[in-house]
Amino acid sequence: MSRQLSILIFIIFALVNSYANAGDDGNLKLNENKNGYVEVGDCFEKVNRGIFGFNQVLDKVNFKPLAKGYRIFPQPIRSGTSNALSNIGNVVTIPNNVLQGQFKDAGLNSARFVINSTLGIAGIFDVASYYGIKKRDKEDYGQTLGVWGAGPGCYFVLPVLGPTTIRDSIGSVVNMIGGDAWYNVTVANDTQYFSEADYYASRLLSGVDFRAKNLESFDSLENSSVDLYASVRSLYLQDRYRKIRNIDKTTDTLSDDDWEELDTQ
């Protein structure tokens, strides 16, 4: 059985499970709490908490020190890095704009990508914003599935990668079978210009950049939370709910772009 067919079977199985809570009329019966956010089942909580604890140790030993070291670099260098990573992210955002019917945003993001990739020197400089083409909301395949009506399925925690749901994990699989142009240029089609190492280096840099932006936020969350695992789960699920419905509202602790690197599964 080919790798692509195996992945397709997994997607179908997971989608069936994500629709398991649909009523007889086919409409999803999602439970919303008093804040309006969908409550997602934590089907593997004991395992999730164990993996979360492992990730916390990994963060303290590796990512947090790397993030602190990264902050030594001058702000212009860090801003340029963030801009370049955001520019690469457009290769996932643009097709999802189209899939969600956001054709205006697809056009604007395409213009941003072309301008910043050329005049902005591989996206290091946000020239498009200078010309009035402002950064749009990031989209991904997990969000698209949500817009199409797929339920989130169970919440779970992945080693190293952190929080996700069945639906968002399917979005990550879509990247591997053609949805992420950057992945396909580097990993799937190793060329003389880009290699698999370039892709994974960019993902590692994304994680370090994300962590560096949120050193104080995470410290504050850790110090103020009675149950850190539950707090992170709540923040992640609220953020995903908000992005799928394009709600202009931030979570209690983290800023609007805080989870963007975690969303690119």
Model-assigned labels for residue ranges:
Residues V16-D24:
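Sec/Tat signal peptide C-region and signal peptidase I cleavage site
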